[in-house]
Amino acid sequence: MAKKLKVGIIGVGGISESHIAGYKADPDTELYAFCDINEKRLHEMGEKYGVTRLFTKKEDMLALSEIDAVSVCTWNSQHAPCTIAALEAGKHVLCEKPMATSEAEAQTMLEAAKKNNKLLMIGFVRRFGNDCKIVKDFIDNDTLGDLYYSKATYLRRQGNPGGWFGDKSRSGGGPLIDLGVHVIDLTRYLMGKPKPVSVYGATFQKLFDRPDCKDRPGYIATSATPDDVCTVEDFATALIRFDNGSVISVEASFSLNIKEDVGRIELMGTKGGAKLEPELELYTDINGYMADVTLKRSTALSFNGLFEQEIAHYLACVRGEAECISPAEDGVTMMKILDAIYKSAETGHEVIL
């Protein structure tokens, strides 16, 4: 019988529970240790999941030689130091998205993984969605032809989650780095991961967290308090141009005066188009007639089992049973894109990569 993998979690905030569910679903994995600077939350989570090895310092947890792999689920500014420390301690790492708060940090993380010969996987969880797999099946079978223009949209009307998400020193940015990263990555992944060559972007801080709004925000972080600051953008838009001539148009917001929240990607190709919002629609021509096509089966993203699939893939990679489909190199490219959007927004000029 194979030895059980022992896993540690660094950062036991809201997103960690999705990782934990994935680990608990694997009979050959043991949830071994938790680490968090918030002692109250740490002990609550330890009691909830029956984990007794609890640490407030990552170095103490990572000193446990029996730990094989780690999930890094901290706020964004701690992704790099926690990931690098884990890799240097000889652990495999699954780091939540975004990989870091800058391309430079991300590159250092990648180098640490290579130096220590350990897996570094980035939590681009949308790649594991049922909707992604269906669209990719159509793309791989050339149903859409050459993809040359796409839209990546993630808009919230009133969705500033508070907590560390609005604090730029911890988050690295607002909806672009928190929400936009999901749809940018998913869209680029489906387009075949072309190389970005230039970016033009703009960011706005107009509505903040709507302090006078009497309606409850739609999304609230576990770390939210009445004293939270909001030093990030509330809306971002960008055009990303790639080496094959294709373009992605991006929109992401925490707060925006729109009718309702929007989460969709749109792909336009030479043979057809596709839209996920949330059900898949295909646009093509059949026998010379314009046709809109939907599938009999549900194609909307299902969160049921989404993170479990991501974790299962991570564990398979750790065991040498699979090749990682969400590697650190893709995280570095994403940070290059995000850095360029923020730089373009600051300077008012296109950024050549």
Which residues fall in each region the model found?
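Contiguous beta-strand/loop segments that form the cofactor/metal-binding neighborhood of enzyme cores
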Residues: 185-281, 309-316, 320-322
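C-terminal helix-rich "cap/oligomerization" subdomain common to oxidoreductases
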Residues: 1-4, 9, 29, 69-72, ...
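Hydrophobic residues in well-ordered beta-strands that form the structural core
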Residues: 95, 120-122, 151, 250, ...
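Short, Asp-centered acidic motifs that coordinate Mg2+ and/or phosphate
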Residues: 33, 53, 69, 149
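N-terminal Rossmann-like dinucleotide-binding module
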Residues: 1-49
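Beta-strand-loop-alpha-helix segment that lines the small-molecule cofactor/substrate pocket
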Residues: 64, 69, 75-76, 80-127, ...
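Conserved SAM-binding strand-loop segment of SAM-dependent methyltransferases
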Residues: 51-58
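Predominantly a Rossmann-like dinucleotide-binding segment in NAD(P)-dependent oxidoreductases
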Residues: 11, 126-229, 348
